[in-house]
């Protein structure tokens, strides 16, 4: 297993990212095909979760995935699950629920609440009190990425103003790297994902990285790419421009409008 080598740090912003793309980060990540020829997925151990390290990793197709009591592990799966936002197909039942709901979607209004909710135990056998791999260090790191304009959340609010679902991830250039989602009301995370697809389509975000394939994602229109093909596309995508997302960039969107062609409205 390759350890990550330290190098000089630089400050990165979404606006200056393209100019700095060749000298990003504090660590030189290994070439996935060289250190993981069998496609297991893990390509490095070590480093830290500083913003410049994370942005450098994502720009090279890697993401961190490790338990709280383990060293940082960097992954680049083979194959890679991705979604083209224009290929997304919501189910008929989800369309019906959206049409009848009085809920709202927002962008970047409750990032910390969303990532904390994503960290809580699911119905996957975790003991009471245990969290997912999204532990305190990860929460702190992605909150910092949110403050710097790279990490974004989509929230779903019910008609009582309660947060009932959401998701978060990173946007670099014209690719969105999905990280996690949650729901406490039926299908709320699916509505958040639908909202994300709408937002990506109108913002020139042409690919969503879903990391690992599963039956649910494939049913929504996701596909798999070989690691080589994903990394080839990534080089272009991270250099492309896309519309800015920030806390006050977009108005709330009624869930009932998800099935319409009306775009997610920008604030004036």
Swiss-Prot record:
Protein name: Leucyl/phenylalanyl-tRNA--protein transferase
Protein's UniProt keywords contain Transferase: yes
InterPro entries per record: Acyl_CoA_acyltransferase, Leu/Phe-tRNA_Trfase, Leu/Phe-tRNA_Trfase_C, Leu/Phe-tRNA_Trfase_N
GO cellular-component term (any): cytoplasm
Domain of life: Bacteria
Catalyzed chemical reaction(s): N-terminal L-lysyl-[protein] + L-leucyl-tRNA(Leu) = N-terminal L-leucyl-L-lysyl-[protein] + tRNA(Leu) + H(+); N-terminal L-arginyl-[protein] + L-leucyl-tRNA(Leu) = N-terminal L-leucyl-L-arginyl-[protein] + tRNA(Leu) + H(+); L-phenylalanyl-tRNA(Phe) + an N-terminal L-alpha-aminoacyl-[protein] = an N-terminal L-phenylalanyl-L-alpha-aminoacyl-[protein] + tRNA(Phe)
Catalytic EC class: transferase
Subcellular location, principal: cytoplasm
């Amino acid at each position: 297993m390759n350890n990550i080598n330290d190098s000089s740090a630089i400050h990165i912003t979404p606006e200056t990212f393209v100019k700095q793309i060749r000298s990003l980060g504090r660590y030189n990540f290994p070439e996935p095909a060289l250190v993981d020829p069998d496609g297991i997925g893990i390509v490095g151990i070590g480093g830290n979760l500083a913003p410049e390290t994370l942005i450098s990793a994502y720009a090279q197709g890697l993401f961190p995935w490790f338990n709280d009591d383990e060293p940082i592990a960097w992954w680049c799966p083979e194959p890679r699950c991705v979604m083209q936002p224009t290929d997304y197909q919501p189910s008929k039942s989800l369309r019906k629920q959206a049409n009848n709901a009085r809920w709202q979607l927002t962008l970047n209004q409750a990032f910390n609440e969303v990532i904390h909710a994503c960290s809580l135990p699911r119905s996957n056998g975790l003991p009471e009190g245990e969290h997912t791999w999204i532990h305190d260090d990860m929460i702190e790191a992605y909150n910092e990425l949110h403050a710097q304009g790279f990490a974004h959340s989509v929230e779903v609010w019910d008609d009582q103003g309660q947060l009932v679902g959401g998701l978060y991830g990173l946007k670099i250039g014209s690719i969105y790297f999905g990280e996690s989602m949650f729901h406490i009301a039926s299908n709320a995370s699916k509505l958040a994902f639908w909202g994300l697809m709408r937002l990506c389509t109108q913002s020139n975000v042409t690919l969503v990285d879903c990391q690992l394939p599963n039956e649910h994602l494939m049913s929504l229109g996701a596909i798999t790419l070989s690691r080589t093909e994903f990394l080839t596309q990534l080089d272009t995508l991270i250099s492309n421009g896309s519309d800015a997302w920030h806390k006050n960039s977009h108005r709330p969107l009624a869930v009932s409008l998800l099935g319409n062609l009306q775009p997610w409205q920008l604030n004036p």
